[in-house]
C-alpha cells in the first residue's frame, strides 16, 4: 500500500483498513509462533502499512487542531 493511496482514503476507510491490518497482524504473529508462516515478509509489510495509516491519521488531526 502506497502513502498516496492512504492519503486518498476517508477517515472511516482509514479506520476500517487499520482494523483489518491489525487482525491480519495478529494472525501472522500466531502463524509465525507456530512455525506455519511461509511468507515472513508479510509481517513487515503489515507493520509498515499500519504505521502509514497511523501517520496519516495523526497528520490530519494535527492539521485540524492547528486550524482551530
From Swiss-Prot:
Cellular component GO terms, alphabetical: cytosolic large ribosomal subunit
Record's keyword annotation contains Lyase: no
One Pfam family here: Ribosomal_L29
Gene Ontology terms describing biological process: translation
InterPro entries on file: Ribosomal_protein_uL29, Ribosomal_uL29, Ribosomal_uL29_sf
Gene Ontology MF terms in the entry: structural constituent of ribosome
Domain of life: Bacteria
Keywords: Ribonucleoprotein, Ribosomal protein
Family, per entry: Belongs to the universal ribosomal protein uL29 family.
Name of the protein: Large ribosomal subunit protein uL29
Protein's organism: Parvibaculum lavamentivorans (strain DS-1 / DSM 13023 / NCIMB 13966)
Gene this protein is translated from: rpmC
Amino acid at each position: 500500500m502506497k502513502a498516496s493511496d492512504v492519503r486518498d482514503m476517508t477517515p472511516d476507510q482509514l479506520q476500517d483498513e487499520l482494523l483489518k491490518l491489525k487482525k491480519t497482524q495478529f494472525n501472522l504473529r500466531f502463524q509465525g509462533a507456530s512455525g506455519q508462516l511461509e511468507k515472513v515478509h508479510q509481517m513487515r509489510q503489515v507493520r509498515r502499512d499500519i504505521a502509514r495509516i497511523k501517520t496519516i491519521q495523526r497528520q490530519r488531526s494535527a492539521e485540524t487542531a492547528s486550524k482551530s
